[in-house]
């Protein structure tokens, strides 16, 4: 029986292990962590005949190399173990690549980008489902891709949100339609340079049969046309903004408050409920994918009327004494947080901080000076953020450390300063205090609802 190892016991790792085991592999799952939660998650695998090694790692000195290694998205692609495995001829892939090997006969929409991926993916899936298609979302959202393999349904399309980590470990994944939402510095601690990060993202679009790019993104606008001369482009700034990118009849754009897709009027933009120009950009990309997949205007318009957003992305939680509390926990870098704050209509109390990332904070700081009447700082980044705010002449900040303190103080300051909203938009990863941005957002939700 051939040997396979899965590294990482998350949702992706569990699904990958089951796919391999189903197809006759002798599977061992490794995870360096060992706790009650992981043991509980792994127990069904053990009962199914899959080996589980917690608090341990694959050691080829103690045991022979397996024929195959599948890694979860959180495992760096260049760790010495995986480099050595590839040199030994071991097949090393990510979980998404494993799923692609089973599901490549189904057309995929692959969505990548620094920011905007999840909302765009959710919009694409919503439109496709409104059109009556069996089009599940997977990857960085929804199902682990290998869960779709196990369900073994007759899929019309697969809609995949694909991170740079997943692209890196999926060398043959080739969507029918590839969408690139935005590009700004992120994940540099993993990818080392901006060029590496860009090239990883670009490789997915290069393998896609049809490319769609956001023409409002400066980096894509500058570098995309040479890479993808046949690409379709989108813009919230009118047909003229597509000049030099594509024929407007081959793009999707806003003109006079109407969505125009491939030369056809689709719907007035005021039907769309989500705030912010960035969400309009996400919508245009989703409409481009839908029209390229042959979906009619009716399904698109009906989705515009009913789609209200996704959790942790400018998600309204509640209103207390006229102050709206908004969860933008997904804003894990400066650019996403700057976009979130810019979408606020009135004076805002901002909650920021967490595990800081590399990046240019200038536009974010400028937006704070323009929109935030006070900033409440949490997590490990709080002292550094305080220093940065002070350096640009912004003094109305407080280090409050925890989410509960921030929410309580936010309500007090909002009342005192006539602010219309308290916005959690951290500009940071969450791993100093939480396991994920979702967990951070749920803590914010619980703290807010505790004040109602």
UniProtKB/Swiss-Prot annotation:
SUPFAM superfamilies linked: MurCD N-terminal domain, MurD-like peptide ligases, catalytic domain, MurD-like peptide ligases, peptide-binding domain
Domain of life: Bacteria
Cited Gene3D superfamilies: Mur ligase, C-terminal domain, Mur-like, catalytic domain, NAD(P)-binding Rossmann-like Domain
Pfam families to which the protein is assigned, alphabetical: Mur_ligase_C, Mur_ligase_M, MurD-like_N
Disulfide partners: none
Main subcellular localisation: cytoplasm
Residues given in the record as ATP binding sites: 113-119
GO term, biological process aspect, one: peptidoglycan biosynthetic process
Molecular functions (GO terms): ATP binding; UDP-N-acetylmuramoylalanine-D-glutamate ligase activity
EC assignment: 6.3.2.9
PANTHER family documented for this protein: UDP-N-ACETYLMURAMOYLALANINE--D-GLUTAMATE LIGASE
HAMAP family attached to this UniProt entry: MurD
Function noted in UniProt: Cell wall formation. Catalyzes the addition of glutamate to the nucleotide precursor UDP-N-acetylmuramoyl-L-alanine (UMA).
Family, similarity comment: Belongs to the MurCDEF family.
Protein name (record): UDP-N-acetylmuramoylalanine--D-glutamate ligase
Species, as recorded: Synechocystis sp. (strain ATCC 27184 / PCC 6803 / Kazusa)
